[in-house]
């Protein structure tokens, strides 16, 4: 009898161990099922927009979502827009992203930033892998999503799309982050339309390089031009009204070659009849390296407002972009977003009254983007 009880306890312990062995990874996988960062929030929120309500979509990498504010543009110029942009984005994924853009919207114009074209082969390979995962984490189930998953070359990458534990097991705060996401995503309304800016500025002046008057144009690699021509064919086949752009960057000697590539591509695209908005060639005239940039690649909240106003003015005056008639609820949502964005910039400006060296100590390289922490901070700031 005693022996039987011991065996029973042993079997029970083994059963519990087996259950825990499978249930704990499963529970962790559920908690990491939906990665929540600024990129995921921005892309997921795109599908919350009223279908066929967006006038302009911007496609690009981190310099786009840190340089342009859709709700600020709405407040100033009354057209609707959205940043379908991802950190480390690559032109290799633009075809899939254009499909996603057109799956719910019929924009009058798509503005494509060209910086994602100029990465090295190694940089492109790494950025495609990372960006593809970010897209898959955010986009709804569709044939396009399935094709993205199928395009991975390794079994591990394919499996990680269904079991994110394999992709994010090294991210220690993922569970807590996604628990916050679950409660936040069920209540927020995409108030800031994917806006993103750094708190402190990290600017060094030892390697500045003036580009005023530099017109040298260097042809990119054959592979790069092939990707550009493939993109143009897609835009032509889909009858997409596309304009290209080059956002401002803090120019250094190391980036001069990229600038010269951009000069070539600008001339190439203009000869083919495409519009091209070049904000980099005039960066020294229209932007201040010390006051408008958070680092070498990205504008801060001051520069973001400057560039948004410049883009809005050009699109409305030169490209015929004007507000479309929106359903009443959609119009109220955009007006609400514009008001929240005003509050957001007030909050940002109040933080920036602290000297930059102190901001670095307090915030490090922290960024402001639409999450529960920021929305709560804005509400508290508004009440003070």
Model regions and ranges:
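Extended hydrophobic/aromatic segments used for targeting, binding, or gating
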Residues: 223, 229-238, 242-297, 301
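Membrane-embedded segments
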Residues: 59, 63-148
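Secreted/periplasmic serine-hydrolase-like ester/acetyl group-modifying domain
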Residues: 127-238, 326-383
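Alpha-helical transmembrane signal-anchor/signal-peptide segments
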Residues: 33-53
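Histidine-centered active-site loop/cap adjacent to the catalytic His
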Residues: 293-333
């Amino acid at each position: 009898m005693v022996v039987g009880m011991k065996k029973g306890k042993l079997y029970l312990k083994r059963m519990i161990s087996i259950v825990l062995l499978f249930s704990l990874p499963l529970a962790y996988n559920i908690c990491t099922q939906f990665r929540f960062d600024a990129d995921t929030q921005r892309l997921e929120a795109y599908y919350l927009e009223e279908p066929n309500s967006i006038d302009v979509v911007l496609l690009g990498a981190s310099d786009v979502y840190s340089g342009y504010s859709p709700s600020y543009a709405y407040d100033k110029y009354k057209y609707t827009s959205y940043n379908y942009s991802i950190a480390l984005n690559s032109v290799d994924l633009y075809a899939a992203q254009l499909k996603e853009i057109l799956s719910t919207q019929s924009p009058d114009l798509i503005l494509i930033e060209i910086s994602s074209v100029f990465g090295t082969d190694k940089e492109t390979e790494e950025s495609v892998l990372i960006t593809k995962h970010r897209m898959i984490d955010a986009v709804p189930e569709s044939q396009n999503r399935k094709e993205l998953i199928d395009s991975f070359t390794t079994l591990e990458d394919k499996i990680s799309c269904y079991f994110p534990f394999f992709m994010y097991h090294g991210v220690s705060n993922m569970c807590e982050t996604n628990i916050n996401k679950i409660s936040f995503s069920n209540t927020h309304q995409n108030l800031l339309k994917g806006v993103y800016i750094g708190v402190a500025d990290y600017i060094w002046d030892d390697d500045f390089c003036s580009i005023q008057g530099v017109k040298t144009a260097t042809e990119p690699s054959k592979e790069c031009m092939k990707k550009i021509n493939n993109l143009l064919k897609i835009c032509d086949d889909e009858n997409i009204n596309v304009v290209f752009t080059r956002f401002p960057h803090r120019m250094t000697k190391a980036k001069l070659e990229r600038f010269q590539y951009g000069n070539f591509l600008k001339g190439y695209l203009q000869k083919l009849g495409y519009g091209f908005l070049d904000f980099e060639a005039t960066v020294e005239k229209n932007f201040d390296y010390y006051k408008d940039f958070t680092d070498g690649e990205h504008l801060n909240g001051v520069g973001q407002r400057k560039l948004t106003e410049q883009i809005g003015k050009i699109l409305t005056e030169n490209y015929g972009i004007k507000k479309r008639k929106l359903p009443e609820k959609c119009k109220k949502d955009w007006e609400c977003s514009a008001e929240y964005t005003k509050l957001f910039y007030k909050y940002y400006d109040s933080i920036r009254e602290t000297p930059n060296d102190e901001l670095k100590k307090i915030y490090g390289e922290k960024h402001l983007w639409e999450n529960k922490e920021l929305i709560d901070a804005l509400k508290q700031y508004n009440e003070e």
